[in-house]
Amino acid sequence: MVTNSPSRSDISVYNGDRQGPMYSLIVPIYNEEDNIPVLYERLKAVMDQLASTELVLINDGSGDRSLEMIRALHDQDKRVCYLSFARNFGHQVAVTAGLNFARGQAVIILDADLQDPPELVPQLVERWQAGYSVVYAQRVKRRQESWFKRLTAYGFYRLLQRLADVRIPADTGDFCLMDRQVVDLLNTMPERNRYIRGLRAWVGFPQTGVKFERDPRHAGEVKYTFRKSLRLAINSLVSFSIVPLRLATYLGLLAALLAIAMMILVLYWRLSETNSPLDGFATVVIANLFFGAVQLICIGILGEYIGRIYDEVKGRPLYTLAEMAGFEQLL
C-alpha cells in the first residue's frame, strides 16, 4: 500500500521514531580520489543552501585512496555518511545501496566525476517543491565527448523509447531527484539487474525534467567503458522490453519463408529443365551459414532473458558491506 507523502514544506521527515534529514545526496564512488576534494567542496556549498541534508557516499570497492578520503570527510563533517562495499559491485548496485540507506524526504543521485553539476540540485528541488515526484536532469549538450559517443547515445535512447514498455525520457542518466514515496517503492523491487532510470520511469507519478549542459569529467579516467555501456544498454532493453524475443520469432519466420522460396525456385528450375543458379557447393554453404546465424541470434536473445531469470532465482544479496558509518547519528 502506498501512502501519501508528508508535506514538502516540512524541514524533516520522520521514520518511525527517528528524525531524518530533509534531503539525501547519493554519490557512488569508484577510484575517484582526484575528484573527491572538489566534489565535496561543491556539494558542501549546495548543502549549506538547503535544509537539513545528508551526503551518502558509496565506495564501490575502490582500489585507490577513495575510502581513506571518505573517512576523513566523515570525521570532518557529520553530514557525510558512507557505505563501503566488500568488492566492486557496479554503479547501478552502488546507487541502489544508497537508496536503501538514504533517509531524506527527497533523494538526489549524482555522479562523482562532476559531469553532473551539483549546482543544478537547487533547480531540481524547486521542481520537487512544485509537486513533481521525480525530477530528472536532461542533457542538451555533451561537452568534449567524441562523435561516436554522442551518436551511439542518441541512437540508443531513441531505440529504447520505441521498444520499452514504459516511456523512459531520452538523454537522461541517473542524475535526478526522487520523492520519498518513489524511493520506498524502488526499495521494494528485488531485481538483480538494475536500470535505475528505467525503474524510476516504471513507478509512474508526476515526473519532469530540467535541461542542462553536461560538463566534461573533472579528473581521472572514464569508468563507463564501451563494454560497460554496451552491457548497460542490453540490460535496459531486456529489462523493459520483450521486443527482442519477438524479433527472434520474426527472424525464424523470415528464415522459414526464405527456405520455402528457395525450395520452390529449385523445384521450378528442375522441372523446367533449365540451369539452376542455386546449384553447387557454395550455395549450400551460404544457406547453412545464413540459417545457422539466425539460430545463434535467437539462442543469444533467449540466453539474455534466461540468464536474468537465473540471476533472480539464486536469491543472492545485491551487495555486501565491509564498512559503514554516519547512519547511527539519527538512530
Swiss-Prot record:
The protein, known as: Uncharacterized glycosyltransferase slr1943
GO cellular component: plasma membrane
Topological relation to the membrane, as annotated: Multi-pass membrane protein
Family to which this protein belongs: Belongs to the glycosyltransferase 2 family. GtrB subfamily.
Keyword Metal-binding appears in the UniProt entry: no
Subcellular location: Cell membrane
Transmembrane parts of this sequence: 247-267, 281-301
PANTHER family linked to this entry: PROPHAGE BACTOPRENOL GLUCOSYL TRANSFERASE HOMOLOG, UNDECAPRENYL-PHOSPHATE 4-DEOXY-4-FORMAMIDO-L-ARABINOSE TRANSFERASE-RELATED
Top-rank taxon, per record: Bacteria
Glycosyltransferase among keywords: yes
Database matches in Gene3D superfamilies: Spore Coat Polysaccharide Biosynthesis Protein SpsA, Chain A (3.90.550.10)
GO molecular function: glycosyltransferase activity
Pfam families xref list: Glycos_transf_2
